Amino acid sequence: MSQDYKTTLNLPATEFPMRGDLPKREPGILARWEAQGLYQQLRDNAAGRPLFVLHDGPPYANGRIHLGHAVNKILKDIIVKSRYLAGFDAPYVPGWDCHGLPIEIAVEKKWGKVGTKLDAVEFRQKCREFAEEQINIQRVDFKRLGVTGDWDNPYKTLSFDFEANEIRALSKVVANGHLVRGAKPVYWCFDCGSALAEAEIEYQEKESPAIDVAYAARDAQAIGQAFGVSVPADVEVAVPIWTTTPWTLPASLAVSLGAEITYVLAEGPAHNGKRRWLVLAAALAERALQRYGVENLVLHGETTGAALENQLLAHPFYPEREILVLNGDHVSDEDGTGAVHTAPGHGQEDFVVSQKYGLLDKYNAGQVTPIDGRGVYLESTPPAGDVVLAGQHLWKAQEAIVGVLRDNGSLLAFHPIRHSYPHCWRHKTPVVFRATPQWFISMDKANLRNDALAAIDTVGWFPTWGKARIQSMVDGRPDWTISRQRTWGVPIALFTHRQTGEIHPRSVELMQQVADRVEAEGIDVWYSLDATELLGAEAADYEKVTDILDVWFDSGVTHEGVLAARGFGKPADLYLEGSDQHRGWFQSSLLTGVAIDKRAPYKQCLTHGFTVDEHGRKMSKSLGNGIEPQDIMNKLGADILRLWIASADYSNEMSLSQEILKRNADAYRRLRNTARFLLGNLDGFDPAQHLRPLDQMVALDRWIVHRAWELQEKIKAAYDGYNMAEIVQLLLNFCSVDLGSLYLDVTKDRLYTMPTDSHGRRSAQSAMYHIAEAFTRWVAPILTFTADELWGYLPGEHAGHVLFTTWYDGLAPLPADAQLNATDFDQLLAVREQVAKVLEPMRANGAIGAALEAEITIAANEEQAAKWQPLADELRFLFISGDVQVRPATTDEVFVSAQPTTKAKCVRCWHHRADVGRNADHPELCGRCVSNVTGAGEVRSWF
């Protein structure tokens, strides 16, 4: 009867669960972290190390987190945790953006506008309470992602200390000469009832009426002279303009031409029984005339825009208004007519050129900007022909204005077009340019633009194209409108002179005093402040500014309110946000940083793409393709979500679908199963007693430690370069190829069959221990919950958390003078592949059932054969085959042949050996198994 030798084998055993069961297990781990105060422990453990500060860009405190939030926070968490392992102290202070319109709107829905049920003080308090509620909701979601940070002490832009530091930051901007006031055209949202900054604008397709309008010459002969021709008495002369905003025509005060553009005097369509000659850019004349129904191009003269400067035209429906011809750099001959109607109250370029010609001094405010903050024409707006404009909304009035132009013969062409148009990012409604008194950070007054462009060169940009993107934005951007006409925000704490409008000469000092009061009592103190408390007898001459600061200024000065205020220093090592933040937080932080310190507030900027479905479509409720992070965590676990984020190419759009999640769950299982196999084979291993020195290891074990060292160097470099996708690929490849298909497969024989405390087995366990120690660290930034779980199962004494350590130092490269060095292993593994190819057809035709049933012959040149012959008896373990013979050959190529074995099979190790049955007490065992069961055990040197 056969004996049962199962009890003589060292089979794997571990309590580390095979199933991750992450949705159930992760909350318990999270609760333990909270109870032990993990974040503070991390900081305490890292005290004295060099700082690495990833500064958190504040999400808006409104609503549950979405997938984009999860991507952002998890990428940050991966980087921060990798910095702890790299030997840094890496504080992470999460923050929230708490002021602004969305919160005002939410409060208005419940309580009405200011003055309805609540006064301004009560309204601000409700806004504060609402924001705090939203923060508490989002904080739970963020923590569930496994993000470790100072959640008990985050920064909030609504906190009194932050609001005070924001006013102090503004005082530095003032001190450095960057703040200006003026009635410039700014983006204006009728729904917000406020000015908008560049960062609050998004472009969407919109249909607009495109019209060509004739501005008749006041003196046709004067224009003819500019062209060097005499104009017949029965000919009218006009300058056509092309616009997509007919509503701005009541504000039209001039027509701009390009000084260096060539213009022609062309025969146009007749008007009121008279011929009409039109002034058109030469490059556009033919196309324009086709729009007007004129088939033949007939030219009467040619000149430049400079020659037409200061000519006078008639407004198309305000006959008493003289329209001056200007020269402007903004005019081109790429589209339209080459002439631009100029409404300084509704266009930035129009404003600049009108200011240059002194037009703003000739007209009152109602003529320059005839619409109010709701988009309604002022009562002072004259009618257009018979059409009353006063009290009408501009969008509704457009059709009537076009009708007036058609009736009086000024309309040369009309057709609707679809084009990209600025919209409010909150309301998704079209915005306009509207000149109102605002506060600006000037881009050029104190050289801010040039200084900011220079600062961009000092920053590392990931991906590299981010640099060119933000450069072009800063280079072309207008002054930054930082004032808002709203209630919930940090006040622009300035006193302006009632007569001159100038700010108080001691403004910087006064702002510091206001900030001290705000720090103690909050922003309401500004509104209740009696000016005499600070200004004394001067108070009667000054008034308080009632505008509040743009929320982009709030978040833009977090380098002052957080980095400087909390002692982290400036600049931060890294800012990391979505790719839309080149025009948002990256830029507002850059401008305030340069305005205050003359340097960028960050050393590096990293951007990630947006999430899309597997077809590249933006995720939305209407398409039904949205995936919520909460659903992923409840079904699969946060570590699966984290693995997807790490494995995706975040520099582009990040695709997610249920199939992609399934693939990541499969990848997670591969990683977990590898870790479990390592732990299972470390059963009974105590590194304090059993760890073998590297130079005493079996050669294969020493080689796998070398491979792990090589891998760790690549992983460290990838973490340093924020290349998480490469790390995931390296890990999966190592688990599948180096371990799964090779090392773990080969060493099973040694681990299972050799005596428990034999050198060969302890050597393999030592290698696995080194790999398990390193592996847990490698995955810790990404699989934060699983690494914590793994850490608790590693043999030996350990620190309280994997992140209390640094990268594993038990790995080392294989010396070049080792008996089998890395090159030797490359050659042997190439032979192993040849063996597998030779055995494949033998398996297919039934000659063998398994590789152990084949005997291998290797023919190699004499030098190679001489090197491999001493290994021959152990090569069968590397190849997982029957006996191996090495023979010298006259060729430089290596040849492998195989034949089925005729030797008996050992029931314990399954190898076919000639000595099976020689021991009478164990007739079914081979000689080495007899030795391993009853004697001193076999000796392994190589594999």
Swiss-Prot record:
Segments carrying motif 'HIGH' region: 59-69
InterPro entries to which the protein is assigned, alphabetical: aa-tRNA-synth_I_CS (IPR001412), aa-tRNA-synth_Ia (IPR002300), Anticodon_Ile_BEm (IPR033708), Ile-tRNA-ligase (IPR002301), Ile-tRNA-ligase_type1 (IPR023585), Ile-tRNA_ligase (IPR050081), M/V/L/I-tRNA-synth_anticd-bd (IPR013155), Rossmann-like_a/b/a_fold (IPR014729)
Cellular location(s): Cytoplasm
Molecular function GO terms recorded: aminoacyl-tRNA deacylase activity; ATP binding; isoleucine-tRNA ligase activity; tRNA binding; zinc ion binding
Alphabetical list of PROSITE patterns matching this protein: AA_TRNA_LIGASE_I
Coiled coil regions, renumbered to chain: none
GO terms for cellular component: cytosol
Gene Ontology terms: biological process: isoleucyl-tRNA aminoacylation
UniProt function note: Catalyzes the attachment of isoleucine to tRNA(Ile). As IleRS can inadvertently accommodate and process structurally similar amino acids such as valine, to avoid such errors it has two additional distinct tRNA(Ile)-dependent editing activities. One activity is designated as 'pretransfer' editing and involves the hydrolysis of activated Val-AMP. The other activity is designated 'posttransfer' editing and involves deacylation of mischarged Val-tRNA(Ile).
Record family assignment: Belongs to the class-I aminoacyl-tRNA synthetase family. IleS type 1 subfamily.
HAMAP family, per database record: Ile_tRNA_synth_type1
Subunit and interaction comment: Monomer.
Record note on domains: IleRS has two distinct active sites: one for aminoacylation and one for editing. The misactivated valine is translocated from the active site to the editing site, which sterically excludes the correctly activated isoleucine. The single editing site contains two valyl binding pockets, one specific for each substrate (Val-AMP or Val-tRNA(Ile)).
Name this protein carries in UniProt: Isoleucine--tRNA ligase
Source organism of this protein record: Stenotrophomonas maltophilia (strain K279a)
Name of the gene: ileS
